[in-house]
């Protein structure tokens, strides 16, 4: 992901607490919410990208919705002409560009750094499990985000 896109996401999603799925989607004025299975491919209809959100939010469904939004950001201009049956949710989840964008959506850099700093001990280490709980994401995603931010150190003993 390029720095310009990261900055845009950071500015639009800036917050000191993790946003819920509805709040995240509402930050994108050309997206509308559908209720259903979060492992769904987003589609374009009537001038809007349709993102599917489950009734109950979990860390895993937050990741799934972030991947849908990432797919729209990465490939949105092509969605209107595509046959949606050619793309599966697995394709989206395996796309490296979508992965980077999804991490930035779930954990904007400033929120990530502030949360990590709040949890850090005197040596600058923090528990990845607690970080994941605070950010409402699976542990593996919290650790993956740290790889893109040079000033973050994670104590991985518990992973």
Set out the residue ranges of the language-model regions.
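Active-site hotspot residues in diverse enzymes, especially metal/ion-binding acidic/histidine motifs
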Residues: 1-159
């Amino acid at each position: 992901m390029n720095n310009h896109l990261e900055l845009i996401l950071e500015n639009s999603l800036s917050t000191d607490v993790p946003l819920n799925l509805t709040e995240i989607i509402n930050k994108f004025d050309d997206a509308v919410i559908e209720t259903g299975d979060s492992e769904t491919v987003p589609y374009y209809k009537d001038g809007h990208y349709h993102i599917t959100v489950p009734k109950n939010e979990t860390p895993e469904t937050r990741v799934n919705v972030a991947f849908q939004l990432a797919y729209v950001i990465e490939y949105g201009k092509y969605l209107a002409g595509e046959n949606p049956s050619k793309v599966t949710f697995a394709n989206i989840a395996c796309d490296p560009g979508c992965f980077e964008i999804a991490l930035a959506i779930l954990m904007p850099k400033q929120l990530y750094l502030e949360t990590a700093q709040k949890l850090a001990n005197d040596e600058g280490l923090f528990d990845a499990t607690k970080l994941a709980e605070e950010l409402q994401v699976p542990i593996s995603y919290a650790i993956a985000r740290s790889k893109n931010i040079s000033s973050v150190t994670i104590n991985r003993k518990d992973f």
